Amino acid sequence: MFSRLLCFLSAGVLMAQVAPTDAGGIARAALDRLLSQKYSELSAMLTPQAKAAYSEAALAKMGAEIQSWGAVQSVGDPMVRKIGTASIVAFQVKFATQTITFQFSVTQEGALAVMLHSPVAPVWQHPPYSKPDAFKEREVTVGEGQWRLPGTLTVPVGQGPFPGVVLVHDGGPGDRDESIGAVKVFRDLAEGLASRGVAVLRYEKRTKQYPQAAQAKDYTVEKETLEDAGLALALLRAQPEVKPGRVFLLGYGLGGYVAPRIAEADGKLAGMVVVNANARPLEDVTLDEAKFRKVTGAQMQLLIEQAAKIKKLSQGDEDTAPLLGMSGPYLLDLQGYSPTGLAKLLGVPMLILQGERDYLLGTKDFDVWKTSLAGQKNVTLKSYPALDRVLVAGQGPSTEADERKPGQHVAQDVIDDVATWMNQ
């Protein structure tokens, strides 16, 4: 799935010049190869499992994005922390246009397990529509055991119980705030909605809290998103300030795409909000993303060929080599899935919102939602001509660079529309 945070699965190091136990040195060597576009040397560092997952298409996609940031101006010292037996090594790299944090997970054997990168966001400030005196926050834990996730519950002040909503992430390893550049989509939504009488639960995505989760052989959208969303809904219903029969789901991007599946599994949703979400298959959206990133020639042809192979997958192809960065089990989990078709069968109240300046989707998928669900009395649709991928208002074509401008927030119109719909 498209994302501001691209997750690259990699592992295994063959480097005579770096001691296997030197996690910082191993990570820095990998970073140097990445920045200098020495992809064959980077590939030589991968274990067989990672080589299977770390496709040429993913390398091409990564390289194109990194080159777009301009020349490297400085690389910070490694910051190392332990999670279990793994070492997480982070570097801040200053490019001509922005500063990026790269994170590497290094196993105790000296293997690279995961690599992530994300922009360093400016200091966040409350949006003008947030009323801090009108809500309170507390830390909660979603789930238990191996994949328990830290979260934040934002609750209106006053006499409840209140309607509540769980926020579900886009693709990639998102944090609980759904931080994208300088914009914190979920934090804005949480404070804005809580200021208007709606309790909000947001949490760290599993692949953010546990990067190794994406490497599991049985990794699917069920493991990535659905399981934790279901647990979060149950947790929200159990809160004394929340009215159990008025619990909603808000899915952003990928979260909106799979919202009907979450609703089907839950069976008790008061409604679901779908925001800037594709209605078409992931492989189709990925090709659109490649065009946006100006991938051409042989690289684009490779993506087209892999998308065609995805269309032909069938049960029994679980062991197929990853296509467009997605494993066989992940792709088969979504094979034949139609979010609009399932939504129509469920009959759950829906609010579908789309920023028309979304540089990846535009209104193409919104039109699919609109056409497919035409005549459904339980469905409300609205598009915003001025809003972009992160629901920020602007003019003209939007770009990823827009997301890095400080002081931007989700538009108040979105907050008001969602709160009004949930409180009706």
Regions found by a protein language model. Give the residues of each.
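Conserved alpha/beta-hydrolase "acid-adjacent" motif
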Residues: 359-365
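Catalytic active-site module of serine/aspartate enzymes centered on a nucleophile-bearing elbow/loop
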Residues: 390, 395-424
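Cap/lid segment of the alpha/beta-hydrolase catalytic domain
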Residues: 167-224, 392-404
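Accessory cap/linker subdomain of secreted extracellular hydrolases
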Residues: 265, 271-345, 375
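Short solvent-exposed beta->alpha transition segments
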Residues: 25, 29-32, 36-87
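N-terminal cap/lid segment of alpha/beta-hydrolase-fold proteins
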Residues: 122-159
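Short beta-strand/loop motif that positions the catalytic acidic residue
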Residues: 346, 352-354
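Alpha/beta-hydrolase active-site loop
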Residues: 218-240
